[in-house]
Amino acid sequence: MRVISGKARGLKLNTPKNEDVRPTTDRVKESLFNIINPYVMDNNVLDLFAGTGSLGIECLSRGAHKCVFVDKSKESMAIVKSNIKKARVENESTTLNIDFKSAVTSLGRQGEKFTIIFMDQPYYKNMFIDALSSVDENNLLEEDGIIVVEHDTKDSFPENVGRLYKSREKKYGNTTLTFYKMEEA
């Protein structure tokens, strides 16, 4: 697994031995960034269920303002931190080694807003709808922002979750990317 573009281009990232962490393949990541690249520059990113931190680090490499990495696994967070250091993006990074609900609630209380929110949790733990609802309830998504949910192609998602609506879906073998945006007020 590597950083595809930007100031850390070509950097090989550390990956865990833990099977719960399923890093986004380079092929899927490249396709994803072809879609979301207009959202990256100078914006804030939330990498929920960060795993290796690959998606957030890719955004920072491409010019994102900052990224908050959230993962409750100590092993995953150790890898995220080592990858942040390796990519030399410590100043633009915040790490939260807590569960997603606590993180989302805390970030909401602080008034944080994000233009890109990644949700790439282990496939067998179906917390996506809960995570989408929490993000909506805590007003974390900028009005013009986008949420990217990476999941197994067998899983289907509702058209709407609170004020969020499904704007797009792309399939890559057994991996699907589902995109949500905020309904206009």
Predicted features by range, described:
Residues 1-185:
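Class I S-adenosyl-L-methionine-dependent methyltransferase catalytic core
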